[in-house]
Amino acid sequence: MSFGQRKLDRSKPEVDFPQDPVPTELRIVDEIQGAGKEATPGATVSCHYVGVTYSGGEEFDASWNRGEPLDFTVGIGQVIQGWDQGLLGMKVGGRRRLEIPSELAYGSRGAGAVIGPDESLIFVVDLLDVR
C-alpha cells in the first residue's frame, strides 16, 4: 500500500524534544500504525527518516532533505543496531519513533561532528516499502 493510497500527510515530521531521561534500552513508539507488509529479518525496506541527537535535539540527518528514501536489508548490520531491532514488526504505511541508547547507535566512537561519543539518538521513521 503506497502513501498516496492512504492519503496521509507524509511530509517531514517534526521530532519532539524528549522529556524522559536518556534511554538505557531501545524505546519504540508507533505514531501511525501501518497496515501493509511487515518488516522481517532479511527483508529489504525503504524508509524516510529524521534523526536528532537526544542531548540537544539537533537534526543530524534526514532522508526527507535529500528527497530520496533509504533502502537497506533489515537485520544484517547495514544500519545501526537500534534500526535493525527497532524496525522489526513495523508495517508499511507506519510511522515509528525510535529512541536509541548510545550502545545501539554509534557508542563511544560517535559519528561525524554532530553525534558525539556516547550520544543517544531519536529517529522518526516512515516505512514506505518492504520487499
Feature annotation, model-predicted:
Residues M1-R131:
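Cross-family detector of peptidyl-prolyl cis-trans isomerase
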